[in-house]
From Swiss-Prot:
Keywords associated with the record: Cytoplasm, Fatty acid biosynthesis, Fatty acid metabolism, Lipid biosynthesis, Lipid metabolism, Phosphopantetheine, Phosphoprotein
Organism for this UniProt entry: Rhodopseudomonas palustris (strain BisA53)
Name the UniProt record assigns to this protein: Acyl carrier protein
Residue positions, PTM O-(pantetheine 4'-phosphoryl)serine: S37
Name of the gene encoding the protein in the UniProt record: acpP
Protein family membership: Belongs to the acyl carrier protein (ACP) family.
GO biological process, one term: lipid A biosynthetic process
Length: 79
């Protein structure tokens, strides 16, 4: 997993309280990791803060899995 992937994984584990082994690229935040809509909003905000970028609402709606988040952040992260 890339450095960005590892940072995403850490945020997901901290915010959702899931086992690190469950945080894989194909894992759906809602279906596999038990997030609700508020959790997903909080994750997006945590990603924005950690990576110094804005995630517009239309982009946030397409970030459904851990892999989606990593791909978006690899393209858009400032740090």
């Amino acid at each position: 997993m890339s450095e960005i992937g590892e940072r995403v994984k850490k945020i997901v584990v901290e915010h959702l309280g899931v086992e690190p082994e469950k945080v894989v690229d194909a894992a759906s935040f809602i279906d596999d990791l038990g997030a609700d809509s508020l959790d997903t909003v909080e994750l997006v905000m945590a990603f924005e803060e950690e990576f110094g970028c804005e995630i517009p609402d239309d982009a946030a709606e397409t970030i459904l899995t851990v892999g989606d988040a990593v791909k978006f952040l690899e393209k858009n992260a400032k740090s």
